[in-house]
Amino acid sequence: MEIANEKRIAGLVQFLWKGRTMTGRFRLPMLEEQAYEYLLAAYIMEVQLRYRRFIYNGFVEEQLKQVANCLTANTAKFGIVLCGGCGNGKTTMLKALQNLVRRLEILKPNLSPNAGHSSDNYYSFTIVNAMQIVQIRKTDYNKFCKLAKADMLGIDDIGTEPAEVQDYGNFMYPIKELLAMRYDAQLFTVFTTNLEPKEIRQRYGDRIADRLNEMMTKVVYRNLTYRTENAQMADGQG
């Protein structure tokens, strides 16, 4: 079906855009193949930090390729869900991405030519555990709001926290609230979880689940835990 007066409507759209800017999507400033190499190197380093031996396998290769694509592709999405069983590399990936962003010193988009070199002009990546978010929401709302506005936020172990907490008779839903705020602001978010997609919907409701589907790419970890003596590679805590 064609739009009536299409040229006039296009002109009105241009008029309404005046003074507005689109929220920039975080992307690594490199091609997908190079992003894969950087992520692999950062991942290996995280394994070495735990005094464990890294052995390359097909699971790791596929996970790294998917994340590299998410971080370089021209897409409307602005987040990643790392989901799967316990101990299979999700937190390691989260920490690898945090370190990579820190070391690359990536400038934010839409800066003025006179912005200078303040640290505020570069992307930063904060990681916080889901249980910590619940506690922060109860004790320090200003800090909670600051987390909600962080350039890039990694949330570890979503689903381990109480979905509902009570404070002086008031019921709060910290993770639902945080995810909704970041969705509205279109801020890059990564989280790890042991929950299945249907369990996420059951736990956080249709509204949040639908928003997550819009904002995030899902990377499923199908491998078994690395936290055994016979495992080929170690994980962080994911």
Task: Please place each PLM-identified region on the residue numbering.
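Walker A/P-loop NTP-binding motif
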Residues: 99-102
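Hydrophobic anchor at the beta1->P-loop junction of P-loop NTPases
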Residues: 82
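Conserved glycine(s) of the Walker
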Residues: 87-90
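Hydrophobic positions on the alpha1 helix immediately C-terminal to the Walker A/P-loop
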Residues: 93, 97
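Conserved nucleotide-sensing/catalytic segment adjacent to the nucleotide-binding pocket
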Residues: 112-183
